[in-house]
Amino acid sequence: MKLLGHKIELWAGLLLPDVSISGMSELRFPEEKPLLRGQDTEMESADTFLSAADTDWKEHDIETPYGMLHVVIRGTPKGNRPAILTYHDVGLNHKLCFNTFFNYEDMQEITKHFVVCHVDAPGQQVGASQFPQGYQYPTMDQLAAMLPSVMQHFGFQSIIAIGVGAGAYVLAKFALIFPELVEGMVLINIDPNGKGWIDWAASKISGLASSLPETVLSHLFSQEELMNNTELVQNYRQQISNCVNQSNLQLFWNMYNSRRDLEMSRPGTAPNAKTLRAPVMLVVGDNAPAEECVVECNSKLDPTNTTFLKMADSGGLPQVTQPGKLTEAFKYFLQGMGYMPSASMTRLARSRTASLTSASSVDGSRPRPCTQSESSDGIGQINHTMEVSC
């Protein structure tokens, strides 16, 4: 995507405007020093991301119109604040998908302000019983329609949704059906497109040529990651094979590959266009198999309330490989929504010079609030999609 025009410098938390051409923007963070601690270690052991820091979580099985949902929750609703609700990708569960991210040290500054609710897709949690033969797995639309039962059970008034892959699709569908229940969204590796007969046939052929775990791995990781057979890939191969019921996984995989198009359109591009109304942060690794799909999703969203985060040196699971960068971006996102105004941003502000280059599409009448670091007097407002490379 070609980015032109307007440039803004971010240094020590200050935005210094230059010339302007409205539109799409890109924010780059040159690496003067590693943002993540321990970057020489690719990932914790499999045991760590499956079991660490689980003592504060409480498990629930919640009845919904389309079957039972396994949910784990930490904390209690805090006044009128939304809950952070997550939904994992196909082949994973909440532990495999989110433990590394939510156990990251700097995330604790966020989670102490919100109740956190992880939803496992039916039959995908660790130790799940196998569904009986002939069981009809819920459609992707039905998976989205199960979530109001979760919110009602815990008394959530609204949510900030974090979804990855298939989970991002489910949460986007939920937000389209129940926009009043969603305050903000972080959508990682989302594919907004439906699967046609050609896609279905290709996935069938691929499935015949390889085992289910290998097929799922090709969805989660880039070809480069798979060819290098990194420690991360080896860990996930083992966990997908041993910690997720394979029969249940096959049902979820089949349903995800039968999904319909989300049918979103950027406002003003089509009569009666519908899109996500809440602020959205799209996230994808620059080496992820979903990169093109996320770029396409960005073209379907309202540019006045969308941030596009493209993470450098990150493959298919940025929440696992780059939890520090994603945590910091999530803090900015929450601050833009008016939450956590005093949260510390000093590490990013002190260690980086960022340039914001814009060029784009639609003039927005609603300003997108930017965040302030502890060292800044003020930051300007941005009225267009912001693409962030870090």
UniProtKB/Swiss-Prot annotation:
Looking at the UniProt entry, the stretches that span the membrane are none
Where found in the cell?
Cytoplasm, Cytosol
Name one process (GO BP) from the record. signal transduction
- What domain of life is recorded for the organism? Eukaryota
Going by the UniProt record, its keywords in alphabetical order are: Cytoplasm
Which residues does the annotated region (Disordered) include? 356-390
Q: Which family does it belong to?
A: Belongs to the NDRG family.
UniProt cross-references to PANTHER family, sorted A to Z:
N-MYC DOWNSTREAM REGULATED (PTHR11034)
Name this protein carries in UniProt: Protein NDRG4-A
Q: Which organism is it from?
A: Xenopus laevis
